[in-house]
Amino acid sequence: IIGQGVAQGGTYNNNKPGVAAAWATLTILENEPVMKTLEQRGKRLMDGISDIFTEDGIIHCMNGYPAMFSYAVGAEKITNQREWNETEKDYYLAIVEALMERGVMPDHDAREPWFLCYAHSEKDIDDTLTAFSESVKSVSR
């Protein structure tokens, strides 16, 4: 149907970089402990954040899964939007801004989760927890 000198264009036609990236991702998932590592590091980060709040006597709750979690301040449990509306969103935002000053960049929206990826190292978790502790201590409620 298509003769000499005729090209067929399309958004996803012949997307060699995309296929190469997908192949590399599948290879890593097949050969490395990606999910186990994400769960372990995410749990460590979640537990560390919770411990920091607990040590400072701050009521909070952790939500989600280790590789994709969030937290809320001022509530022990959140099961619906009304409960979330009662949380200390301004305090959350102040902590986020203090974190950004220290090189950690979570989303400003407390409903958005923190995402981990396989590239995050144990040192990244350590550095994040240090920045989190400093940020919580630096921000007044």
What are the residue ranges of the model-derived segments?
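Conserved N-terminal phosphate-binding loop of PLP-dependent enzymes in the Aspartate aminotransferase
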Residues: I1-R141
